Amino acid sequence: MLEFLTRLFSKDGGSKNVAKERLRLVLVHDRTSISPQLLETLKAELIKVISNYMEIDEAALEVSLDSSGNTVALVASIPVKGMKRVAGTA
């Protein structure tokens, strides 16, 4: 019984932090009028264009919107595995 109460009232915050991050993303999406579907489409287009020049880890690619005050930034974390040779370059 004590273990249950300890878990119930613990200050672990794991699920609290996840819920807070999800709410933040929803609010940012609402403020910018960008739907999650549009963000996924943008992510797919970024993969397509960047893949022309670099070998990237598509599974680890992350794209999000970050809000700071009145500004919103598109933040992309794109792990690069290597560069591709582009026609016409030495």
From Swiss-Prot:
Output the Pfam families linked to this UniProt entry: MinE (PF03776)
What is this protein called in UniProt?
Answer: Cell division topological specificity factor
- SUPFAM superfamilies in UniProt: Cell division protein MinE topological specificity domain (SSF55229)
Q: What domain of life does the native source organism fall in? A: Bacteria
Query: In which family does this protein belong, per the annotation?
Result: Belongs to the MinE family.
Q: Tell me, which GO biological process terms does this entry list?
A: cell division; regulation of division septum assembly
Q: What does this protein do?
A: Prevents the cell division inhibition by proteins MinC and MinD at internal division sites while permitting inhibition at polar sites. This ensures cell division at the proper site by restricting the formation of a division septum at the midpoint of the long axis of the cell.
Protein keywords: Cell cycle, Cell division
Identify the InterPro entries for this entry.
MinE, MinE_sf
Coiled-coil ranges from the UniProt annotation: none
